[in-house]
């Protein structure tokens, strides 16, 4: 280094503005022919990323189609969500809509069962 210690260089960099730091990074990229972007992790063929192997614990319950028994579906929506009659009817009329978000798997399955019993289709995401 030409006259600057590491501490002096760090102090100089820490006093720069964001724009100056951005220009410094660009200049260093050009000077050394590198990129400051983080490299993407390589996935070996035949294996899936660790995130995909974890089992999902929370689900969104989405009402797909109402079927023929709209009144019974509205009743189930009210039971599951605690909504008033008008809000539940609006939700059913606007299907496909999310009925409940971030529920446990067992609860989501139970809600799905209630809807399928009255003829509605439900999707868990």
Swiss-Prot record:
The keyword S-adenosyl-L-methionine does not apply. Gene3D superfamilies: 3.30.1390.10, Single helix bin. It comes from the Bacteria. GO terms for molecular function: mRNA binding; structural constituent of ribosome. One of its GO terms (cellular component) is cytosolic large ribosomal subunit. CDD domains: Ribosomal_L7_L12. Coiled coil: none annotated. Transmembrane segments: none annotated. GO terms for biological process: translation. Keywords: Ribonucleoprotein, Ribosomal protein. Homodimer. Part of the ribosomal stalk of the 50S ribosomal subunit. Forms a multimeric L10(L12)X complex, where L10 forms an elongated spine to which 2 to 4 L12 dimers bind in a sequential fashion. Binds GTP-bound translation factors. Belongs to the bacterial ribosomal protein bL12 family. Forms part of the ribosomal stalk which helps the ribosome interact with GTP-bound translation factors. Is thus essential for accurate translation. PANTHER family: 39S RIBOSOMAL PROTEIN L12, LARGE RIBOSOMAL SUBUNIT PROTEIN BL12M. This is Large ribosomal subunit protein bL12.
